Design a protein with these regions (language model features):
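A short glycine-enriched loop-to-beta-strand structural element that forms part of the catalytic core
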Residues: 74-76, 80-85, 238-256
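Catalytic NTP-binding/metal-coordinating core of nucleotidyl cyclase/transferase enzymes
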Residues: 142-213
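Charge-rich, low-complexity N-terminal segments
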Residues: 1-154, 162
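Catalytic cores and conserved motifs of cyclic dinucleotide signaling enzymes
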Residues: 16-21, 55, 274, 286-290, ...
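Short beta-strand
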Residues: 37-42, 193-197, 237
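A short beta-strand->alpha-helix segment at the C-terminal rim
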Residues: 228-238, 245-251, 279-310
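Intrinsically disordered, glycine/charged-rich C-terminal tails and inter-domain linkers
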Residues: 124-125, 132-134, 285-351
Length: 351
């Protein structure tokens, strides 16, 4: 059997009658498929434990995910090969904690609130792959390191060190967060996973058959940033936000890397380093995307690829052809020298 524990919040405040109705309906539906459990309700929080055959539990969870009264569903734990039920006599017992004066019940309500808040915070600092393992009932620390094929994305802000020395620290931090937010959302929308942030850099990976999606994430990011530049005021740092992306494809080491103090679930290898070299190359070729022949050949969609030349990149044994994409947002690129010249001219005008 399978057991799932989750927390969710309600999209609006529910009355006692509505919560009781949810409990009654759940009891009837769960009894039909042999699912047992308990539902705790405290203010806007639902905490529920479901147990039964895996297919039946997943069916109940699918209905819950689609229920418009739930939002922010967070699976705390999933257990497989469960042999004994914790709530064998309850198809769904509902416990309403609101309004109870009993100190124990109040403590439980506060605990649920704190658990939810803590998990939401941890989510923001944790790689999606690690969260996925946890929701599947897998201890991430036990996942073995493996060799796999991936499309690697490496991106960062052009002339960041120079710009960060000219503008207020608050505006610099805002710019980095903005860049990482836009890029990360595009990566996630197209099926990639952010592996890590290193200063103003983002490292992500896509499955080997999703090279098109990796390019889409880069192109759409560049388009959105181009729009930001066009609408920003002359003295705003966003006016000078340019970024570059390197895309490579090949074998990487994927898994837990770190120490007893701090672990990362990440990717390592020559292909990751190559993506970083390609990102740096974008300044030289004057285009926001630089990608390898392997990435180009893995694409299934009709892209307007441009051969930017053959380059002998650091760490590579021989020169190799490098490509970009012919898109207005991709070719709207400036290097460090061009950005510093624009900023210097602006400073002269202001003084």
């Amino acid at each position: 059997m399978k057991r799932i524990m989750y927390i969710s919040t309600t999209t609006r405040k529910l009355t006692d009658e509505e919560v009781e109705a949810i409990g009654r309906k759940s009891t009837v539906n769960n009894a039909k498929v042999g699912v047992t459990g308990v539902l705790l309700s405290a203010n806007e929080f639902f905490f529920q434990i479901l147990e039964g055959e895996e297919e039946d539990v997943e069916g109940v969870m699918e209905r819950i995910r689609k229920d418009p009264r739930h939002q922010g569903l967070l699976i705390l734990k999933a257990e497989y090969e469960v042999t004994n039920r914790l709530f064998g006599n309850w198809s769904m017992n509902t416990v309403r904690l609101d309004g109870m004066s009993d100190m124990l019940m109040q403590a439980v309500r506060i605990m649920l609130e704190n658990i939810t808040e803590t998990h939401r915070i941890i989510e923001r600092y944790t790689q999606p792959a690690v969260l996925q393992f946890m929701t599947e009932g897998i201890n991430p620390l036990t996942v073995p390191v493996k060799k796999t094929e991936q499309v690697i994305l490496f991106g960062d802000i052009v002339a960041f060190s120079y710009l960060s020395g000219l503008f207020p620290v608050e505006e610099v931090a805002e710019l980095v967060n903005l860049f990482l937010d836009i890029t990360s959302k595009k990566i996630a929308e197209h099926g990639g996973q952010v592996t890590k942030y290193v200063g103003d850099c983002v490292v992500a990976h896509f499955p080997p058959d999703r090279a098109d999606d990796a390019i889409k994430a880069c192109v759409e990011t560049l388009r959105e940033i181009q729009e930001l530049r066009q609408t920003a005021g002359q003295c705003r740092l966003q006016k000078y936000l340019y970024c570059g992306f390197g895309l490579s494809k090949g074998p990487v080491i994927e898994g837990n890397i770190g120490s007893s103090i701090k672990m990362d679930y990440t990717v390592l290898g020559d292909i990751v380093n190559l993506a970083a070299r390609l990102e740096s190359l974008t300044r030289e070729i004057g285009k926001g995307i630089a990608l390898t022949e392997a990435v180009r050949d893995a694409c299934g969609e009709s892209w307007s690829f441009v051969h930017t030349g053959d380059f002998n990149l650091k760490g590579q044994n021989a020169s190799q052809p490098i490509y970009s994409v012919n898109d207005p947002a991709v070719v709207d690129m400036k290097n460090f020298q061009e950005i510093s010249t624009i900023v210097s001219e602006l400073c002269c005008e202001l003084t």
